[in-house]
Amino acid sequence: VDAGLWVIRTSCEYLRNMLDRGIWTTDMQLGVNISPKQFHDPGLIASLEHSLKSYDISPDMLTLEVTENLLIDDFESVVDKMKKIRDMGTRFAIDDFGSGYSSMIYLKRLPLDILKIDREFIANLNSDKDTLGLVEAIMMVSRHYGLDVVAEGVEKREVLEVLRSLGCDKYQGAHFSMPV
């Protein structure tokens, strides 16, 4: 079985198990990393639909996380495919924003729901005013486009406090939990 398809199927199976055990609720989302190769697989949409239906998972419980590297090739076909998946109800996050070929045009043209700020920005937040300014600007632009913002790599309470003061209320990192 292709690893990418296995990840989607296993994620849906995991959600079903957690829902049945009362550990997960239908208003929660699970982020699933999708590689550029997996995204460009012609069978992705059918596999996603099949897995969601097989495990009786609402599409809005999954957030597909893609990186900026996905956008290098054939931007228009990427946008079209993202729109089709989003029309099913599945959400999209751009992961590690700022680490690749960052372009504000992505935020304007892509059907995104979430922007995840790369950990390199977050790690230097307290010690570098330029980084603080960039994070503040990224958050302001994200809000303008109606995107939720997730700060990746939060490892210290001091950084968490700065992020809260900037209006960021979603975080990920060792301060909360190690990756699963």
Language model features by range: what are they?
Residues 1-77, 153:
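Catalytic core of bacterial c-di-GMP phosphodiesterases, primarily the EAL and HD-GYP domains
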